[in-house]
Every structure is written in C-alpha cells, then in structure tokens.
Amino acid sequence: MTVHFPFDNSYAALPDNFFARVAPTPVAAPRLIKLNRPLAERLGLDPDWLDSPEGAEILAGARLPEGAASIAMAYAGHQFGQFVPQLGDGRAILLGEVIDRDGVRRDIQLKGSGRTPFSRMGDGRAALGPVLREYIVSEAMAALGIPTTRSLAAVLTGERVVRDQIQPGAVLTRVASSHIRVGTFQFFAARGDREAVRALADHVIARHYPEAAQADAPYLALLEGVIARQADLIARWMMIGFIHGVMNTDNCSIAGETIDYGPCAFMDTFDPKTVFSSIDHMGRYAFGNQPPIALWNLTRLAECLVPLLSADEDKGVEIAQTVLGGFAERFNATYLAGLAAKLGLFTTQADDAQLSQDFLAAMAKGRADFTLTFRRLSDAAIDPTELGTVRALFDDPAAFDDWAPRWRQRVTAEPQDGAARQAAMRAVNPAYIPRNHRVEAAIRAAVDKDDFGPFHELLTVLTNPFREQPEFDRYADPPQPHERVLETFCGT
C-alpha cells in the first residue's frame, strides 16, 4: 500500500537556479515519535497510513512519495548583521506542496533529511533535542493563535548525530504557507539577477498576496503586505513574551509566519533586555529589540525590490522609505490594541496606552512573571479590588501598588460585567506557555532516557493554553531558581 500525497508543486516550476534537486538520505531505522493527526487530515493525508512503518519511512526521508518535488531551496541572508551570499537549505528538503482542505497551499518539508548542495560543512542531519523543541513550540504557537509553521511529525532515524554531545538523530516534517524568506530575495539581488527577483516577486504575489496583483503598483503592494504581516506578527510575539533568538533575514518569512525556532524561548520574569540564545552575545535579538530588528530585516527586503518599484533608483528608494515608515504605526496599533485587551479594556480612552506601558514598567521593576501576572489579573477581573494574588508576584510591588487603583478605575468603566470581562481576558492571556524549563525537561527525558512521556504530556497541556486544566496546574508555574534555563542553543 502507498499513501497518496496530493502534490501540486509550484515552486519547483521556477527556474533551476531557485533550488537544487536532491533526494533525502535514507536512514537506518525510522521510528515515529509523534504524528499530528488533525494536521494530517487538514492536509488531505491519511493519518492511519502515516502512522504505519511505511509512513514513518516517508516521514524520515527513507522513501519518496510519488510526485515529490524533492528540492533544497536557495537563499542568502544577513546573520547577526553580516551578509552571507549563499546559505540555502543545508539540512532540509521540500517534498512538495499540497492544497489543504481550506484551499490554502502548504509546503511539506523534511528537516534533518541529509546533505544538500547547500550543506557546506554540515552533516545535513538534525538532533532529537532541536526537533522536539520545534515541534513543541510551533504547535504551542499555533494553539496561541500566532502565525507559525506547523509540525506534522517527528521521527527518530535510528542513527546518532554529533553536536556538543552525541544525540539520537531525528527528522521533523514541517508544514508552512511557504519557506520563502527575505533571504530568498537577497540571494538573487546580491547577484544582480533582476529577472529572478521579478519572477520570485510574481510567485509570491500569486501565492501569498493575490490582492497585490490588482493594485496599480503590484510590487509596492507586495512590500506593503509583507510589512503589515511582519508588524502584526512581531506585535503578537511581544504580547506573549516570545523571544525568537535568531532573527536573521533568512529566518524572516515572506508569508508572515514564525519560522526556524532554533534557540527560541519564552520570557519568565519580565525584562525587555532578556536574551536566551547562546550565540546572541551582544543581545541583538533581545526581547525588546525584536520590533526594530524586524524593520531592519524588512529594509533589506525593500532594497531587493527597489528596481521593481521604479526604473529610477532614487525614486524607488524614496518609495521604499515611505512604505517602511508605516511599519511603526502598524506595529503600535496591533500591539497597543493587544495590550489593552490583555488588561480587559475593550473600549478606547486616551490614556490606555500609558496605562499599558506603566503596567509593563511595574512588572519590570518588580521582576514579575510575564505570563502569570496577566493571567492572575484576568482571574481578578470579576472583582478588581481583589488583587492580592497579582501583587504577590512582584518582588517589589511599589510600582504595582501605584498602578492598581488606576486600572481598577479604568476597568470598571467598561460596559461588561465581571464574568464577561474575565472570560474576555482569559481568552487572550494564556495559562500555559512552553515554559523553558518544561521544554528542557521533556527534551532531556527523551534524549537521555528514551522517555517521551513528558513530551506528549506537555503537548497535551499546550494544545489548550487558555483553558484551566487543574490536573496540570504545575505547568502554569514559573521555574524554581534551580529550574531556570539561562541559555538556549540553536542545535545546528
């Protein structure tokens, strides 16, 4: 029996310099760890077959399904501000594209599937730890409502890989709206290949921004669309305390999805300077730097598109600068509206933005836990005078004590009753996030003991992040001092 992948491959129809055709490297003994059955069904795939030994072979790259494109995509990128003219998929192979049940085109990619022409000195493989991290966090982000790539499956290869230590090898099957990045445009722009930039832009418009095709200036509309999606995405990150960790231009999705989870982390104690990534020595990608870094990345995209914006280079630059100037307004509108909702404010008053910013400042001064503070504020929404459980989260509650009466006065001016206010706040303030120490514990159990129980349990909790789960209350707790994760690692 063979499974049918209803491939409809568009990227593989682009010119040959957009990718390299390469087959996955077979592995010794594929063993399925986790299959995302609801996602498989959404993609029009048979989850029962994928859950079989033959399915595991497909998901590990040991066999290719009929009609697979099997390509490694070319791209460049700025890595920590330094331009690298050729990167590309060094350990990932795009099997192909399918149209899901919602009519949306989706990439299906194997990550850790062997060497490609873009591997440079790498082995093309993935270690189990990073595969589990991406599976956990990407699926948690989806449950939180954040645009993201998805994880269809995680498979053990039966082989070992050498990183800082020897680990079991694994393959992640990743699903995305596409894997086109800012760095994909940079790859061709750096080579002066304007026709390739135009072909890529036309492909992106057709796939992700069809409304731009009807605009008077389609490439300008494309740039505006990418800027809007990135501004909204980063605002959503900031609302949940997510730190990407490696916001290079090759990790910036043109589709506006969170991609490449590497050394990502979630903030515990609120501090805008928080950095977890072991390779971010200067704090370039710290939590509070994410909005300006996103704008920096978008500026690199705009540079690639200047020749398409106007035949006159100076005019093209002027157009790009004007459009980039709209990033801050879009980001602030999304971010401040989100913060207001987290505080239970669903009408608008002039001082709402200041109230939100003052709350964040109080959290920073008091070293309060970001996620738990907002959640407990939601719990107090029925009776805004009962803020003791929120206050208890602050090492130094002085600033919170100054802020709390202002919030009480403001929130009681809202038209909802207490129960409706609480329900609305709980719908945007999660009880459960992928706490770094919980993710690390799940990874360690799997890598060190071949015990996937903590991994599966954590996924169960994170599938419903906004709903109280009394049997899993411990997953809402911040880490104890001895549990704190101080650094996260890329895993490549």
UniProtKB/Swiss-Prot annotation:
Its EC number is 2.7.7.-, 2.7.7.108. It holds the Pfam family SelO. Mg(2+) binds at N251, D260. One of its GO terms (molecular function) is AMPylase activity. ATP binds at G88, G90, R91, K111, D123, G124, R174, R181, D260. Its cofactor is Mg(2+); Mn(2+). Keywords: ATP-binding, Magnesium, Manganese, Metal-binding, Nucleotide-binding, Nucleotidyltransferase, Transferase. It comes from the Bacteria. The keyword Ribosomal protein does not apply. Transmembrane segments: none annotated. The active site is at D250 (proton acceptor). It is an enzyme of class 2 (transferase). It catalyses: L-seryl-[protein] + ATP = 3-O-(5'-adenylyl)-L-seryl-[protein] + diphosphate; L-threonyl-[protein] + ATP = 3-O-(5'-adenylyl)-L-threonyl-[protein] + diphosphate; L-tyrosyl-[protein] + ATP = O-(5'-adenylyl)-L-tyrosyl-[protein] + diphosphate; L-histidyl-[protein] + UTP = N(tele)-(5'-uridylyl)-L-histidyl-[protein] + diphosphate. The keyword Protein transport does not apply. InterPro entries: SelO (IPR003846). Belongs to the SELO family. HAMAP family: YdiU_SelO. NCBIfam families: PRK00029.1 (NF000658). Nucleotidyltransferase involved in the post-translational modification of proteins. It can catalyze the addition of adenosine monophosphate (AMP) or uridine monophosphate (UMP) to a protein, resulting in modifications known as AMPylation and UMPylation. This is Protein nucleotidyltransferase YdiU. It comes from Rhodopseudomonas palustris (strain BisB5). The gene is ydiU.
